[in-house]
Curated annotation (Swiss-Prot):
CDD domains the UniProt entry points to: 5TM_YidC_Alb3, EcYidC-like_peri
Organism of provenance: Porphyromonas gingivalis (strain ATCC 33277 / DSM 20709 / CIP 103683 / JCM 12257 / NCTC 11834 / 2561)
Protein name listed in UniProt: Membrane protein insertase YidC
GO CC, one annotated term: plasma membrane
GO molecular function: membrane insertase activity
């Protein structure tokens, strides 16, 4: 660095120092600036405090405004309907009592006045929190709003009707109109509105619907009540179907239109019928914990036709009531076949011939008897006698055939002695000779089974009928307090492995009597019809094993059903014993001997049997040649 540069830098430094020293503030100005800074800081703190206080006071003073702003963001046009006080609206007639809530405008409670639970308490199909009905509204401003979150206003209220109104604005609203039919279990619901184009899009054609219910336990046996609890549904103009009642969980998606959907238990049901149809149906059910206060949780979601045209409406019918077959059938009177509700299918009567027997024979007969007798023990006895009388002509032929087999037993034993041995050749000869004897005498080895075979359709039909008919519910007879449930004469609380699971923790007396009478019937009839053949000896234990199985199976079933089976076995034994006095065995034996001298045309069954025997004999000989 040269001398000139150094001198220049020194001069610049002196100039800057001199300028700063000449322009420095005096002590009075410094003090004034300090005081001004302190005051400014104080004023800033006061301003912030006042702002915070003002904000707090504003928040305390105007919470509704803030909530309204937040509500509008979520509910849009229906934001105002999210505020309100919930109110209960009661509707009632002589059959049922309902409670509706202004929040959601839906039914919250259903009481059946004429019925009690198994332990004598009022019977509710559902109460608060056990059922939900919701219409998800897809609004004009692209929001999805649930009616369950909105408050309706009850208008036009009477003891049996009310209109729940959801106001959109002063000129637009959505109505849910409820009308309880007089002395009936049905409730009409109509969805309508005014100026709906201000709420829904102009191209709207379908409205969403959601419905759910927890099925309450009403009967003593949770297991058997749950067995008949399920979601039923009817296709539009077609048949009735259901979800599985045995699966722990089941669900279906149905694209076909449905006419109605039902959440049913053993004796009662909640049904939603659409005047038009349901589409996009999703049904689901899940079994509750065994032995709890609930049976299944049922849900449905669907859509139904609804648009924004003036005067548009959608009609529905709720049914909340007992599954009385004749009453449900009466709902279809005067309707065209394609319009029938077919609610009687909610009463399970079996399939094909068994449903036919119950529908056209058992139910009309029991309905007739109820006009003259109030005791169901007597009615079941008369039904049993009627069935036995109906099949008695055919049963007599069966007893006659059994008598023939019994008279031919000594001759069959002679054939067995003539062809002893257990080799295939001896067995074929023995069987052929026995068949020839039966054919010559005019006896049929299978005819003795006819009485039991004739009873099977009625026995199975009754198995379908008694557990599901509400007519015997809480009807007592002798020691049985309720013929629709088991009649425990002895019970225990300890859980015994396998026994408690399959038999139960009680002893049903009618079930025990049924088993004893069945064993007596088997023992008596088999002793009378035993021909001494080896096949009979091998199969003689099967009926006893079956009876023991029935003892376990029916112990928790309806005592009325066990009572019927008990009567049926006793009457059958009496009929069988009576046939011994009615049938003259000496004349019958003479007729059998006379038949042997007459040429007889082979029956088709006997011809097929002999042909099968010839084929077996031919195969046996071919096998021997190969050896």
């Amino acid at each position: 660095m040269d001398k000139n540069t150094v001198i220049g830098l020194v001069l610049i430094g002196l100039v800057i120092f001199g300028f700063s020293w000449l322009n420095r503030p005096d002590p009075q100005e410094i003090e004034a600036q300090r005081k001004a800074a302190i005051e400014a800081a104080r004023q800033d703190s006061i301003a912030k405090a006042e702002a915070e206080l003002l904000a707090a006071r504003t928040q305390e003073a105007t919470p509704d405004s803030i909530k309204q702003a937040a509500g509008y963001n979520q509910y849009g046009l229906l934001a105002a309907a999210t505020a309100g006080a919930e109110e209960q609206v009661e509707l009632a007639n002589g059959k049922i009592a309902l409670k509706l809530s202004t929040k959601g405008g839906a039914i919250r409670e259903v009481l059946l006045r004429d019925y009690k639970t198994y332990d004598g308490k009022p019977l509710y199909l559902f109460r608060e929190g056990e059922s939900d009905f919701n219409l998800p509204l897809r609004t004009l401003d692209n929001r999805l709003v649930d009616t369950r979150d909105l408050y309706f206003s009850p208008i036009s209220r009477t003891d049996s009707s009310v209109v729940m109104r959801l106001a959109v604005d002063s000129a637009s609203y959505l109505d849910l109109a409820y009308v309880l039919l007089p002395d009936d279990y049905r409730l009409r619901m109509t969805v309508s509105g005014q100026n709906l184009q201000s709420l829904f899009p102009a191209n709207m054609t379908m409205q969403d619907l959601e419905w759910s219910q927890r099925i309450r336990r009403q009967e003593k046996s949770w297991k058997f009540e749950n067995q008949y609890t399920s979601i039923y549904y009817k296709y539009s103009g077609d048949e009735v179907d259901r979800l599985s009642d045995s699966k722990q969980e089941d669900k279906k998606t149905l694209e076909e239109p449905l006419h109605w959907v039902s959440f049913k238990d053993k004796y009662f049901a909640s049904v939603l019928v659409c005047d038009s149809y349901f589409e996009n149906n999703k049904l689901a059910q899940k079994t509750a914990a065994a032995g709890s206060d609930y049976l299944k949780n049922c849900t449905m979601s669907a859509t139904f036709p609804l648009d924004v045209r003036p005067g548009t409406k959608a009609g529905f019918t709720f049914f909340f009531g007992p599954l009385k077959y004749n009453m449900l059938r009466a709902y279809d009177k005067g309707m065209k076949a394609e319009d029938n509700l077919d609610l009687d299918h909610l009463v399970y009567l079996g399939a094909s011939i068994f449903r036919w027997i119950n529908r056209y024979m058992i139910i009309p007969a029991s309905t007739f008897l109820q006009q003259y007798f109030s005791n169901w023990g007597l009615i079941i006895l008369l039904l049993t006698l009627g069935i036995k009388l109906l099949i008695s002509p055919l049963a007599y032929k069966g007893y006659l055939s059994s008598a023939k087999m019994r008279l031919l037993r000594p001759q069959v034993q002679e054939i067995n002695a003539k062809y002893p041995g257990k080799d295939q050749e001896s067995m074929m000869k023995r069987q052929s000779a026995t068949m020839n004897l039966y054919r010559a005498a005019g006896a049929g080895p299978m005819s003795g089974c006819l009485p039991m075979l004739l009873q099977f359709p009625f026995l199975i039909a009754m198995y379908m009928y008694f557990p599901t008919t509400i007519d015997i519910r809480q009807q007592s007879f002798l020691w049985a307090e309720d013929l629709s449930s088991y009649d425990a004469v002895f019970s225990w609380t300890a859980d015994i492995p396998l026994l408690s699971q399959f038999y139960g923790n009680h002893v049903s007396l009618f079930c025990l009597l049924m088993s004893i009478s069945n064993i007596l019937y088997i023992r008596y009839t088999m002793n009378q019809s035993d021909t001494g053949q080896e096949g009979m000896a091998m199969l003689k234990w099967m009926p006893y094993i079956t009876t023991v199985m029935f003892l376990f199976f029916f112990n928790q079933n309806a005592s009325g059903l066990c009572y019927y089976y008990f009567l049926s076995s006793i009457i059958t034994v009496i009929q069988y014993m009576s046939s011994r006095f009615i049938i003259n065995e000496e004349k019958l034996m003479a007729k059998l001997e006379a038949n042997k001298t007459k040429p007889r045309k082979k029956s088709k069954w006997m011809a097929r049997l002999e042909e099968a025997q010839r084929q077996q004999e031919a195969m046996r000989r071919q096998q021997q040649k190969r050896k």
